Amino acid sequence: MKDGVRVDNYYPRLRDLREDHDMSQQQVAEYLKMKQPQYNRYERGLRDIPTDVLIKLAQLYNTSTDYILGLTDR
């Protein structure tokens, strides 16, 4: 926790964004140049998401990294 803000519960947003864009985990994993099980671990909150992956996801979904992390509502 930094400055009273929790950013360890971003993973539900990853799934919501993916589903809102009608994408499968496999499609997102291919975009990120990784295997689907690795992406699945991010989406389920089993692994911390690296900064470079976070940035690529924000670009893919045309949103901010702050939104993905739950720091803003858009």
Feature roles, as predicted:
Residues 22-41:
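Short alpha-helical DNA-recognition segment
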Residues 1-20:
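A short, Lys/Arg-rich alpha-helix, primarily the initiator
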Residues 19, 30, 59:
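Alpha-helical residues within the helix-turn-helix
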Residues 32, 43, 61, 69-72:
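DNA major-groove recognition helix of helix-turn-helix
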Residues 52-67:
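DNA major-groove recognition helix of helix-turn-helix/homeodomain DNA-binding modules
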